């Protein structure tokens, strides 16, 4: 499989998201900032300096929704509005949106980059357009990648520390914890039209898992740390961390073509 490097020179790249105009948004968790890569290769800073952005979404009114210490909306003019804040949460990591524009977000209860921090489990929350929020599932040590099934009935969440892919049935609140430790540490994810999960596996490339959590195939990525993925039609993008034997592949955005199409991703309305 041929991968093309389309952006590089960052720290820990996360949150790849395709905007309505076809440009791509991504964040640098450690270096700070949210960036837009245009189809012509031009690169713009959308949100300067903001660190800890593990998830991004386009907002229905324009601008971008970012995670971090809280969840914010940065509009097209650069104005920032806090959408949701909750005391006791160290930060919000990756998130996804449903067809109504509600946000499903993983809450972190400890500083994940502090090796001495006690790994206190967090939760998966759903944030509604009125600003209310509720817990969908708990006992998630290190909430990371998050995505919804095409029918909106199931939310998938990766737990990096415990190496689990968690499958939540939204209506019943039942869950299925799938052990993916044999393949690597799970990180960001995307869903294809068949409902399969394309899961970034740190030190393990990308795995395509069926909706019930069975591994269907693996894809090699030319970097030692794969952090997240997203689709634009049958184009697959992957992001990487800041360590690689090849400097160009550290903290970069990669692109390739695959034989499936990504499921629709909805704008946020909260």
Language-model-detected regions and their locations in the chain:
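Sequence/structural signature of beta-propeller modules
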Residues: 1-2, 251-270
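A short beta-strand motif characteristic of beta-propeller blades
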Residues: 2-7, 41-48, 79-86, 132-138, ...
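Beta-rich, blade/repeat-based domains predominating
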Residues: 7-21, 49-68, 87-105, 109-111, ...
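Beta-propeller domains
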Residues: 25-44, 72
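Short glycine/acidic-enriched loop and turn motifs that connect beta-strands
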Residues: 31-33, 72, 110-113, 162-164, ...
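A short loop-to-beta-strand structural motif that recurs across blades of beta-propeller domains
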Residues: 33-35, 70-72, 122-125, 164-166, ...
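Short loop/turn segments that connect beta-strands within beta-propeller blades
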Residues: 37-41, 75-79, 127-131, 169-173, ...
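Glycine- and Gly-Pro-enriched alpha-helical subdomains that act as flexible
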Residues: 147-149, 153-169, 173-175
């Amino acid at each position: 499989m041929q991968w093309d490097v389309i952006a590089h020179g960052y720290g820990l790249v996360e949150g790849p998201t395709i905007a309505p105009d076809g440009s791509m948004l991504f964040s640098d968790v450690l270096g700070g900032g949210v960036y837009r890569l245009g189809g012509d290769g031009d690169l713009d800073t959308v949100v300067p300096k903001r660190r800890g952005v593990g998830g991004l979404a386009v907002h229905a009114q324009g601008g971008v929704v970012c995670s971090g210490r809280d969840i914010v909306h940065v509009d097209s003019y650069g104005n920032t509005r806090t959408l949701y804040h909750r005391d006791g949460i160290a930060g919000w990591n990756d998130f996804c949106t449903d067809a109504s524009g509600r946000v499903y977000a993983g809450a972190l209860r400890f500083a994940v980059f502090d090796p001495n921090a006690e790994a206190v489990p967090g939760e998966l929350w759903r944030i509604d357009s009125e600003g209310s929020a509720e817990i969908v599932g708990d006992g998630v040590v290190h909430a990371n990648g998050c995505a919804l099934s095409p029918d909106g009935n199931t939310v998938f969440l990766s737990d990096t520390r415990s190496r689990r892919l968690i499958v939540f049935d939204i209506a019943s609140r039942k869950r299925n914890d799938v052990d993916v430790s044999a393949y690597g540490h799970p990180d960001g994810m995307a869903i294809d039209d068949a409902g399969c999960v394309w899961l970034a596996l740190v030190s393990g490339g990308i795995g395509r898992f069926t909706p019930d959590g069975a591994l269907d195939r693996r894809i090699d990525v030319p970097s030692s740390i794969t952090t997240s993925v997203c689709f634009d039609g049958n184009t697959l993008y992957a992001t990487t961390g800041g360590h690689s034997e090849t400097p160009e592949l550290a903290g970069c955005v990669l692109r390739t073509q695959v034989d499936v199409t990504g499921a629709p991703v909805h704008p946020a309305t909260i």
